[in-house]
From Swiss-Prot:
Quaternary structure, from the entry: Part of the 50S ribosomal subunit.
Protein name: Large ribosomal subunit protein uL22
Name of encoding gene: rplV
Domain of life where this protein originates: Bacteria
Family: Belongs to the universal ribosomal protein uL22 family.
Entry-linked HAMAP family: Ribosomal_uL22_B (MF_01331_B)
Organism the protein comes from: Desulforudis audaxviator (strain MP104C)
Upper classification of the organism: Bacteria, Bacillati, Bacillota, Clostridia, Thermoanaerobacterales
Keywords noted in UniProt: Ribonucleoprotein, Ribosomal protein, RNA-binding, rRNA-binding
Cystine pairings recorded for this chain: none
Tagged with keyword GTP-binding: no
Gene Ontology terms, MF aspect: rRNA binding; structural constituent of ribosome
Length: 113
């Protein structure tokens, strides 16, 4: 059985967030949270929050045992970019794109149905 949690429009670059989610894919929920606690990247906090939410969804909605939960799938999709202008010399301007991410976590206990 599976449970899912999604965090949308997170102000993180998807490329930087994908580096962090690779560390926890396939690990147990408690092990994944322990790894993220000691990961210095800023994305680690956001990923940990989504994993906790997915585990809480599994416990509350599906009556699953938290100790048996595994991070079955975790992926990061790109959200909309916030466009800002940076003034440059001679009256020009460059576009600065602040990228956003959608983080999806699916936890499973290994049982079917």
């Amino acid at each position: 059985m599976e449970a899912k949690a999604v965090a949308r429009y997170i102000r993180l670059s998807p490329a930087k967030a994908r580096e962090v989610v690779g560390l926890v894919r396939g690990k147990s929920v408690d092990e994944a949270l322990a790894i993220l606690r000691f990961t210095p990247q800023r994305a680690a906090g956001a990923v940990a929050k989504v994993i906790k939410s997915a585990a809480a969804n599994a416990e509350h909605n599906n009556d699953m045992d938290r100790t048996r939960l595994v991070v079955a799938k975790v992926y990061v999709d790109q959200g909309p970019s916030l466009k800002r202008f940076r003034p440059r010399a001679y009256g020009r301007a460059n576009v600065i794109k602040h990228r956003t991410s959608h983080i999806t976590v699916i936890v499973s206990d290994g049982k079917e149905g």
